[in-house]
Amino acid sequence: MEKPTRQTPFYTQHRAELLVLSSQIAAALLHALARVVEVGSGLKERVHPFTVLQIRLFITVLGCTAYLWRARIDFLGPTGLRPLLALRAAGGVFGACGFYLSISYLSLSEATVLNFIAPLGAIMLTTYWEGRTFAFLDLIACITALAGVVLVLQPIPIYKAVAQAEISSSISTDPYAHLKGVVSGITGVAGGIVAFSAMNRLGKNVQPAVTINYFGVSICIVTTAFSTIMPEVVWPTRIESWCLLAIIGILGLVMEYLLTAGLGSDDPRVTIMIYSQVLWALFLDWAIWRSHVNVLTVLGSMVVVASLAVPYLFRESSHPKEDMFSTRSGMDDIEEGQDEAHANYISLE
């Protein structure tokens, strides 16, 4: 590959990084809008998280299905990999439902940082599956990331010890509601770990649109089933809610496209751009809900991002020619689990 010269336009030289960065801006925006409709910020009705997921993934499924049909790709994927695709979808359902429930009770930045733990858990699980020794660097990264999450979630004793400031308006003042958010987030992380681990095993043997379709269809089926047994899971009645949900769905489709296009590059800087979603979440918390971003929140976010990014960069620099495929696959597919992520994906998730 020819080395870029000084005359190379900035966009051409950094196209992949800019695409992934744009995808994370889209992801943060759609998550912020999802929280707006879930908590009813400035609206006259609240929309249940399952309804948000149902409409968002329905639009994504339509887009992916149209692409697969035009490209003449089998909707179900390779026969031998369908059990793994189903496992990825099942994990994704728990991951997305947990994340979207958590943003009803936690701030956007809290839920996002918590969701980013899933990739580290996936590395641990795939290491166990493959019978490999767990690297010391990964162990340190996991411990550091958990410490960062504690700083972001700020248990009451720690928070009071640092400052007696008023609790942010974006965080529920009800301790039980906050606990629900944390439990939902942890459930999402568990689902994300399963989803990312399955994607690690799938590798590049499956078209990304097929993987997304499995996940999207599963979400639509599950949320539709819940709508029949949970009276609160209903479609919105106001036009502004529908407009926001449509924007969420379109942003989700745009995010998937930008992420897939950007991750075609082997440059490790591209993957690092995924972690910028934490910064956008912090900014949107302040811009929309005027949340008080304290030192612990910023420090915890930086610790989590560093614990994810540093081990990856270390591997890339230590083994430039080695195929670090199993690790890259999980990191590359983080926005598909959150939502995701991480999800996500999430995401992380």
Curated annotation (Swiss-Prot):
Assigned protein family: Belongs to the TPT transporter family. SLC35D subfamily.
Protein name per the record: Probable transporter vicT
One GO CC term, this protein: membrane
Highest taxon of source: Eukaryota
Lineage: Eukaryota, Fungi, Dikarya, Ascomycota, Pezizomycotina
Source species of the chain: Bipolaris victoriae (strain FI3) (Victoria blight of oats agent)
Parts of the chain that traverse the membrane: 49-69, 89-109, 111-131, 133-153, 179-199, 215-235, 244-264, 269-289, 294-314
The keyword Hydrolase belongs to this UniProt entry's keyword annotation: no
Keyword Transmembrane helix among record annotations: yes
One family name in Pfam for this protein: EamA
Compartment list: Membrane
Function: Probable transporter; part of the gene cluster that mediates the biosynthesis of the secondary metabolite victorin, the molecular basis for Victoria blight of oats.
InterPro entries: EamA_dom (IPR000620)
Membrane association type: Multi-pass membrane protein
UniProt domain EamA: residue ranges: 25-153
Keywords, alphabetical: Membrane, Transmembrane, Transmembrane helix, Transport, Virulence
Stored SUPFAM superfamilies: Multidrug resistance efflux transporter EmrE (SSF103481)
